[in-house]
């Protein structure tokens, strides 16, 4: 028996990464998981080294980031890798989630995998927001003020919760210090959730583009899919390096190179690009409390997909109507991102309201109706044949 199988610890690694049977038909969309693992490792390592030179005191936070950029050897590389790594992390995560939506990865027996994935998504958004505030530039200060103020919409106790989060009556030194502490902690929670995600996936194995069980047609992970993953890893690193070395500030906001000033309000307060769709949903609802509920509902609605999708065929590979509505949903999501960066004025508010309605309609109206229609067509075609 090979040593990797006889050793207790190596056998665990072997069963997950070497001999793990994978469907032979999986395509490059299944490589997003390995890229997300790479992104998480990059973020944790660069974050740890940056934390060695960062000061969470509100008077020193902005200056300490500049100190990392100017005085620490290769500090600029750490900072730009960490900042752009967050953007690439979300870009790959959105592609990973789109793959799950398109190929029905949320369907039984992988519902638990999907639920843990949604929790990872929420935790990653929290980590990104906390990290953005730690820079304490102008957009960081006002972003922290706006987002934490959302809790004031909670009846009776909202204002007390906001002051508890701030540690005072405004975003101040205690706010940045506790945000930094949480920002350091959350990635390790995400890493633990990733392990749980991986364990849940290991129970029934990966899905495949055909939407069938496919237990008889599988190949070992190592030798086939490890090298297939390496192709996308190298492509990812090339594109990532182009941003880090040649265009490091493209995905950021110029206002964040101005120290945070509570006395000067920016012309437009916007979060990072990867949070813009949900920011657009928040702004499309005039009522503050309903806007907050709608924004969080836009994330949690992902959890209802296993209940609303009643199709007898997993995934959209062979379903024309579902394909059409899926790509309309993707276009609508991108539109929400664009609207999130626009000023709150006509016609962007109205467009945001229509796009928000279509976003929720996809999960709660279109998916169940389309699955019913396609099931009917499937049974009619089966009977005729």
UniProtKB/Swiss-Prot annotation:
Compartments, record wording? Mitochondrion inner membrane
Q: Which residues bind heme b b562?
A: 82, 183
Q: How does it sit in the membrane?
A: Multi-pass membrane protein
| Stored Pfam families | Cytochrom_B_C, Cytochrome_B
Task: Please give the biological process terms from Gene Ontology that the record holds.
Answer: mitochondrial electron transport, ubiquinol to cytochrome c
Q: Where does heme b b566 bind?
A: 96, 197
Parts of the chain that traverse the membrane: 32-52, 76-98, 113-133, 179-199, 225-245, 289-309, 321-341, 348-368
| GO MF entries | metal ion binding; ubiquinol-cytochrome-c reductase activity
Database matches in InterPro entries:
Cyt_b/b6_C, Cyt_b/b6_C_sf, Cyt_b/b6_N, Cytb/b6-like_sf, Cytochrome_b, Cytochrome_b_C_euk/bac, Cytochrome_b_N_euk/bac, Di-haem_cyt_TM
Keyword Nucleotidyltransferase: yes or no? no
Cofactor(s) for this protein?
heme b
How cofactor binds (record note)?
Answer: Binds 2 heme b groups non-covalently.
What's the domain of life for this entry?
Answer: Eukaryota
The UniProt entry, under Gene3D superfamilies, shows: Cytochrome Bc1 Complex, Chain C
Q: Which UniProt keywords apply?
A: Electron transport, Heme, Iron, Membrane, Metal-binding, Mitochondrion, Mitochondrion inner membrane, Respiratory chain, Transmembrane, Transmembrane helix, Transport, Ubiquinone
Please tell me whether the keyword Aminoacyl-tRNA synthetase is annotated for this protein.
no
Other facts noted in the record for this chain = Heme 1 (or BL or b562) is low-potential and absorbs at about 562 nm, and heme 2 (or BH or b566) is high-potential and absorbs at about 566 nm.
Record text on subunit structure and interactions: Fungal cytochrome b-c1 complex contains 10 subunits; 3 respiratory subunits, 2 core proteins and 5 low-molecular weight proteins. Cytochrome b-c1 complex is a homodimer.
Query: Which family is annotated?
Result: Belongs to the cytochrome b family.
**Stated role:** Component of the ubiquinol-cytochrome c reductase complex (complex III or cytochrome b-c1 complex) that is part of the mitochondrial respiratory chain. The b-c1 complex mediates electron transfer from ubiquinol to cytochrome c. Contributes to the generation of a proton gradient across the mitochondrial membrane that is then used for ATP synthesis.
PANTHER family per UniProt: CYTOCHROME B (PTHR19271:SF16)
The protein depicted here goes by the name Cytochrome b
State the organism of origin: Monosporozyma servazzii
């Amino acid at each position: 028996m090979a040593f990797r199988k006889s050793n207790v610890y190596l056998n665990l690694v072997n069963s997950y990464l070497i001999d793990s049977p994978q469907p032979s038909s999986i395509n490059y969309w299944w490589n997003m998981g390995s890229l997300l693992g790479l992104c998480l490792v990059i973020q944790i390592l660069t974050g740890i080294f940056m934390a060695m030179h960062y000061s969470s005191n509100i008077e020193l936070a902005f200056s300490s980031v500049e100190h990392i950029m100017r005085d620490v050897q290769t500090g600029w590389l750490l900072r730009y890798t960490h900042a752009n790594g967050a953007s690439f992390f979300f870009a790959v995560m959105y592609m990973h989630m789109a793959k799950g939506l398109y190929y029905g990865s949320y369907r039984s027996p992988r519902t638990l995998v999907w639920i843990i994935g949604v929790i990872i998504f929420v935790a990653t958004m929290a980590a990104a927001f906390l990290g953005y505030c730690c820079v304490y530039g102008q957009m960081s200060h006002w972003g922290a003020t706006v987002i934490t103020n959302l809790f004031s919409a909670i009846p009776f106790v909202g204002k007390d919760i906001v002051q508890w989060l701030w540690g005072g009556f405004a975003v101040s030194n205690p706010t940045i210090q506790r945000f930094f502490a949480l920002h350091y902690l959350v990635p390790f929670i995400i890493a633990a959730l990733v392990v749980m995600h991986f364990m849940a996936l290991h129970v029934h194995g990966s899905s495949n583009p055909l939407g069938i069980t496919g237990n008889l047609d599988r190949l070992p992970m190592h030798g086939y899919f490890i090298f297939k993953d390496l192709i996308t890893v190298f492509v990812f690193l090339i594109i990532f390096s182009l941003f880090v070395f040649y265009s490091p500030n493209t995905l950021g906001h110029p206002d964040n190179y101005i120290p945070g000033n509570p006395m000067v309000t920016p012309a437009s307060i916007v979060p990072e690009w990867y949070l813009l769709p949900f920011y657009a949903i928040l702004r499309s609802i005039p009522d503050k409390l309903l806007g907050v509920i709608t924004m969080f509902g836009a994330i949690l609605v992902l959890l209802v997909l296993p209940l609303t999708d009643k199709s007898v065929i997993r995934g959209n590979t062979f379903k024309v109507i579902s394909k059409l509505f899926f790509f309309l949903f993707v276009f609508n999501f991108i539109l929400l991102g664009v609207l999130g960066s626009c000023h709150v004025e006509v016609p962007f508010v109205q467009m945001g309201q229509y796009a928000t309605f279509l976003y929720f309609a996809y999960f709660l109206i279109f998916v169940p109706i389309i699955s019913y229609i396609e099931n009917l067509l499937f049974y009619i075609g089966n009977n005729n044949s």
